[in-house]
Amino acid sequence: MASILRSPQALQLTLALIKPDAVAHPLILEAVHQQILSNKFLIVRMRELLWRKEDCQRFYREHEGRFFYQRLVEFMASGPIRAYILAHKDAIQLWRTLMGPTRVFRARHVAPDSIRGSFGLTDTRNTTHGSDSVVSASREIAAFFPDFSEQRWYEEEEPQLRCGPVCYSPEGGVHYVAGTGGLGPA
């Protein structure tokens, strides 16, 4: 539970999903979790869930009609997933770089140490998902964390997490401001 002093630069939020192929393998799930921590992301919220097919269809609506749509929807509803809200000064781009290319074959060749390069099986079973823009991040976070208020987080929690000493709670799986005891959000 080491305390880390954060930088004064503003934090950005992104959604990170760990897909059923990785959640089904505890060692892979833990390896991905450790990569999140070792890359200095703050875990703002985390939850595991079973995604209903209807929710998958709504989430991936922009891909409806494409050849992979049905396969992706079925796969994402096939088992538990883990959803994170991650914060970092450049969270979206850093998470996308850490994930590696969507296509596993490409990931293995151009980013072999990326999450997808290391653990991806196919272009659908590629271990992770991440938001591709600030607008997508807001929409996707709201889909997985409907009770999370991004505006309130930026007003109340972000300044504390950005400037204060921050600790990680292995029990809760999230970061918190030192001195708060790690009970709930910052």
From Swiss-Prot:
GO biological process terms, semicolon-separated: apoptotic process; CTP biosynthetic process; GTP biosynthetic process; negative regulation of cell growth; negative regulation of mitotic nuclear division; UTP biosynthetic process
Binding site for ATP: K19, F68, R96, T102, R116, N126
Expression across tissues: Expressed at a moderately low level in many tissues. Most abundant in kidney, prostate, ovary, intestine, and spleen.
Cofactor (UniProt): Mg(2+)
Enzyme class: transferase
Pfam family membership, one: NDK
Active site: H129
Keywords annotated in UniProt: Apoptosis, ATP-binding, Kinase, Magnesium, Metal-binding, Nucleotide metabolism, Nucleotide-binding, Transferase
Family classification: Belongs to the NDK family.
Role: Major role in the synthesis of nucleoside triphosphates other than ATP. The ATP gamma phosphate is transferred to the NDP beta phosphate via a ping-pong mechanism, using a phosphorylated active-site intermediate. Inhibitor of p53-induced apoptosis.
Protein name listed in UniProt: Nucleoside diphosphate kinase 6
Gene from which the chain derives: NME6
